Amino acid sequence: MAFPAFAEEPEQPITGSCGEKLTWTYYQSTKTLTIDGNGNMPNYPADKYEGSIAPWRNNSNIDNFLEKVVISHGVTSIGENAFFWCDKITSVTIPSSEKSIGMGAFYSCKALTGITIPNGVESIGEDAFSNCDGITSISIPGSVINIGYGAFSSCGGLTNVTVSEGVKNIDEYAFYYCSQLEDITLPDSVTHIGVNAFFQTPIYNYDSEWNVLYIGNHFIAANQNISGEYTVQSGTKTIADSAFSACGNLTDITIPDSVVSIGNHAFDSCGLKSINIPKSVTNIGECAFYTCFDLKSINVNTDNPAYCSEDGILYDKEKTEIIRFPQEKTDTSFAIPDSVTSIGNDAFLYCSGLKSIIIPDGVEKICDNTFFDCSALTSITIPNSVLIIGENAFERCRESMKVNYIGSTEDWGEVIGDGKNVLTNANIIFCCGISAKHSEGGKNILVKVINIADGKNVILALYDGDRLVEVQQSGEYSENSREITFTPSKAYTNAKVMIWESLGSLSPVCNVKKLK
């Protein structure tokens, strides 16, 4: 007897959503997960104890078997930890619509044998492909701006990396401990290489046999035994983070005009006595000259568009930020220029010879570690324009230090905040002074009188270059009029605001405020 044939029922996939406009579909027969839709995938925690992990990772029928991932065109980001430790995935398809690959997205996908990153991806996140031992070769397209911290670290099978022209930043540890990586191509477009980006790869295996290490036109590292003078190769584009770190016997360095970037901590703990910055350098990283205890001067080419120097001190081009006061500079006192509005991180760190510093009115921020371990500092003048004092800005300074504060006790209470113990215990002297600024429209000049008794005269002197063009007098002010507004009747290039005991006095009673 014959039995009728029945059609096989189609497989019912497992489905769900992963974002407002994205859906996912998993077919058990092919072990394939497809993500469709338009927009960004959400970020997920790596561990379920930290929150809701990616839905396919939360389903043992998928997580234990998933081999193939297809991301359809329209998806614009792969979320953080989306396929974290999916160690059976062998293939991933990424569309050209993709802009970013999130942190840990394919972390420890050990069976993944290859990956094509399409042109259009702009960012590869921290640890995105870390510990993917099956990947043997990777090409980074020029659309990628940033290769994140540890992005391909510990990829034990990786032998070849090609970074295309256009890529700008390679973060710390990006290819760390890729134990078979010997073939590396870097373009001239790269302007930053983080510390240990290629450390523990075969190019470091014989560090005792080389003095310096380059990859293409990028200076990666110097052997700490290097001594005396060294000239960076002509054509070099970047000096990587910590490239000369701990080269204590390096006393002189020549940087060619081709270099555009000096990395973070690039010359940390070197024996340099002076350094010349060429006009080509447009980026100097944080702490580039950290603990250079013999450094007396930093000299910048006058044609440099990003930086300048005066008397061996490093500033930004407009002299609005003081970046580094050399640690071995012999000055015992220093008045920061009136143009400065910000004092950078570590700007005076370990300047143990300085005893007195005057900060001008107009400075708004003293950054982290600015005066750290200025152990001889006994006096500092701080105006009430300062709104922020960073962490450890005065750490390891003398607790008996005298602080001349041009402002009120209320102002001081607001700026000092919590945790700035040295300044909390310092000898605070509330000084007289004036502050002045242009009104929002730019024509009027607003003057504020600070800690000065009633009955004094406020004088405004206007100049065209060095030529005095106009003088205005406020008349005597009282407690009820501590702010005065001047309206100049003539054009001027700079101005001075002064307070006098009387018009017959020979000198002002406090600081003279200059304005442009």
What positions do the PLM features span?
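Exposed aromatic-hydrophobic patches
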Residues: L446-V449, S481-S489
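Short proline/glycine- and polar residue-rich coil/turn motifs
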Residues: G120, G166, G475-R482
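Sec-dependent signal peptide cleavage junction
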Residues: A2-Q12
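Solvent-exposed serine/threonine-rich low-complexity stretches and specific carbohydrate-binding patches
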Residues: V469-E479, V512-K514
